[in-house]
């Protein structure tokens, strides 16, 4: 992750992707704690931090005018992207809250973290070629290839 943040031509986002339970969320939360610590020590000219939002909660946040500010958060993390419904109905209108949020953040070049269990093919299939193509420009992808750290999984 340090390499992704210090590239000569940095992208304005990081995607942590891989199977369940291999440390994506743990790394994101550790980075959030590090920024909070450094912020408290005065290492930044402006207050900075990461707001973490579960992908399933984005549709509710984007409908509420008071919480629409989530889209302008300087550093936003979308946790577990891919678990949410791609489209939602709002008074008869079909909305794509995560896609709309990602397109907005792409256009404004706002730093976005994403954790997901989806691979590149799954992202293209769920969100379409347009978002997948924008991710190529926007995100430094860090694959997590380890198996689950949570122990034995249930065989179902």
Regions found by a protein language model. Give the residues of each.
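Walker A (P-loop) ATP-phosphate-binding motif of ABC ATPase nucleotide-binding domains
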Residues: 13
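Conserved glycine(s) of the Walker
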Residues: 21-24
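Hydrophobic anchor at the beta1->P-loop junction of P-loop NTPases
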Residues: 16
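Pre-Walker A adenine-sensing motif
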Residues: 1-8
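Conserved nucleotide-sensing/catalytic segment adjacent to the nucleotide-binding pocket
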Residues: 43-107
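Hydrophobic positions on the alpha1 helix immediately C-terminal to the Walker A/P-loop
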Residues: 27, 31
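Walker A/P-loop NTP-binding motif
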Residues: 33-36
């Amino acid at each position: 992750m340090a390499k992704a943040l210090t590239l000569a031509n940095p992208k304005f986002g990081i995607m942590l992707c891989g199977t369940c339970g291999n440390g994506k969320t743990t790394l994101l939360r550790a980075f959030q704690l590090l920024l909070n610590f450094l912020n408290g020590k005065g290492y930044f000219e402006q207050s900075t931090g990461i707001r973490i939002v579960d992908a399933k909660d984005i549709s509710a946040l984007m409908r509420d005018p008071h919480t629409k500010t989530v889209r302008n958060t300087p550093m936003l993390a979308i946790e577990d992207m891919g678990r949410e419904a791609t489209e939602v109905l709002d008074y008869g209108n079909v909305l794509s809250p995560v896609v709309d949020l990602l397109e907005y953040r792409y256009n404004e070049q706002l730093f976005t973290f994403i954790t997901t269990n989806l691979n590149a093919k799954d992202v293209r299939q769920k969100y379409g070629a347009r978002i997948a193509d924008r991710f190529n420009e926007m995100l430094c992808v860090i694959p997590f290839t380890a198996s689950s750290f949570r122990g034995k999984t249930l065989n179902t």
